[in-house]
Structures are given as structure tokens and as C-alpha cells.
């Protein structure tokens, strides 16, 4: 497999993770995530020890949804965690975990920084997703873009500065709020994936720096 193929494969994982944070799982998405091809993907991903526990939780939750009521319960989890904005939620915005302010504002410094990254790449947050640019789903989608369109050093810098600096705090808060455990598993898998990419990119960047 060429490096281009590897980068595209990794980009697909970031796109998947982005989609899970961008919107709730509906009936069509559930079919995609539990299809034969998806089962093979989850099985392959679970072979990596750092991913196994998270992937097993994601798979068991998705495969266990057998009726509309169970699907609605998962959708309610998404809404309660990411859309409501109460003490029982875990808003997926970098600014809430990086700002030193007691009550950080949305559309603040991290949003502006992420908007500039998007602008430099001639991208923008789509109108059907009216969220600040430092929403985790946006950042993951941008990371997928970088894996297909940028050098290793750019990928590494973005992972280190824009993900590694706050994801652990987000996961700690999310775990306290997410009783079902599905989205905690998705977030934990995201951090493990980011850390693996950083570990793989650092030696490659060091060789040419």
C-alpha cells in the first residue's frame, strides 16, 4: 500500500469520527455502520490493542439497536450531551477546554484560529452545520482533509496543537455525563487514533527537519 493510500485510509477514519460527532445516528446511518463492510472495518480496527475496548463498545451498542425506541434513546444521548448545553452535557468545542476563563465564549479565540485554518485551505463550515469552527466534528473533518492534501509536518502540527491539547479533558467530562458509554467510547477511540498518528508522524517529520 502506497503512502497516498495509507493517508486516504486514515482520512476515512477521521471522516467517520467526524460524522459521529456531527449528528445523531439515524436509521440510514445505523444501516451503514452495521453493514457487512462496516463489521469488517470494526473487526480490523479492534485488532489494535489501544482501540479494542472502545471499538467493542461502539460495535455492541450499534449492533444492539433492534427497534426505533433504542435508536431514539441513542439520539437522545447525542442531544443531551452535545446540543443542550447544561451541566450534564459535554459540549464538543475546543474553546471550552482551552480557555482560562470561567465562562468561555463560543466563537472565541479557538473558533477564530480554526476559521483561519479553514480559510487558508479554501474551506468553510457548511451552512447546514451552524456550529463554531472549533467543534470537534469540524476539526476532525479538517484533519481528514490534511491527510489528503498536506505534508506530514502540517498534519503533525495540527494534531499536536489542536487536538492533543484538549481531547483528554473533553473525554473526562464526557465520561461523567455519558451513562450509556457509546459517545465516551467514540471520543476515547478518537484520542487513541490521534495519539497513534502523532507517534507515527513524529519520526517521519524528524528525518526531514
From Swiss-Prot:
Coiled coil: none annotated. Keywords: Chaperone, Cytoplasm. The keyword Manganese does not apply. InterPro entries: Chaperone_TorD, DMSO/NO3_reduct_chaperone, HscB_C_sf, TorD-like_sf, TorD/DmsD_chaperones. It is found in: Cytoplasm. The keyword Cytoplasm applies. SUPFAM superfamilies: TorD-like (SSF89155). GO terms for cellular component: cytoplasm. Its main location: cytoplasm. GO terms for biological process: protein complex oligomerization; protein folding. It holds the Pfam family Nitrate_red_del. PANTHER family: CHAPERONE PROTEIN TORD, CHAPERONE PROTEIN YCDY. Involved in the biogenesis of TorA. Acts on TorA before the insertion of the molybdenum cofactor and, as a result, probably favors a conformation of the apoenzyme that is competent for acquiring the cofactor. This is Chaperone protein TorD.
Amino acid at each position: 500500500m502506497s503512502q497516498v493510500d495509507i493517508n486516504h485510509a486514515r482520512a476515512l477514519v477521521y471522516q467517520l469520527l467526524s460524522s459521529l460527532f456531527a449528528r445523531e445516528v439515524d436509521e440510514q446511518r445505523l444501516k451503514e455502520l452495521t453493514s457487512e463492510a462496516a463489521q469488517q472495518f470494526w473487526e480490523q480496527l479492534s485488532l489494535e490493542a489501544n482501540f479494542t475496548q472502545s471499538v467493542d463498545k461502539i460495535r455492541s451498542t450499534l449492533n444492539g439497536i433492534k427497534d426505533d425506541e433504542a435508536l431514539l434513546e441513542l439520539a437522545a444521548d447525542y442531544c443531551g450531551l452535545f446540543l443542550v448545553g447544561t451541566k450534564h452535557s459535554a459540549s464538543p468545542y475546543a474553546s471550552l477546554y482551552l480557555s482560562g476563563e470561567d465562562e468561555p465564549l463560543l466563537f472565541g479565540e479557538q473558533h477564530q484560529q480554526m476559521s483561519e485554518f479553514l480559510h487558508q485551505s479554501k474551506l468553510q463550515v457548511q451552512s447546514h452545520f451552524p456550529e463554531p469552527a472549533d467543534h470537534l466534528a469540524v476539526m476532525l473533518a479538517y484533519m481528514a482533509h490534511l491527510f489528503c492534501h498536506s505534508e506530514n509536518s502540517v498534519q503533525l502540527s495540527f494534531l499536536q496543537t489542536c487536538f492533543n491539547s484538549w481531547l483528554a479533558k473533553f473525554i473526562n467530562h464526557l465520561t461523567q455525563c455519558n451513562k450509556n458509554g457509546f459517545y465516551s467510547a467514540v471520543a476515547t477511540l478518537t484520542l487513541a487514533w490521534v495519539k497513534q498518528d502523532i507517534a507515527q508522524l513524529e519520526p517521519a517529520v524528524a528525518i526531514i527537519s
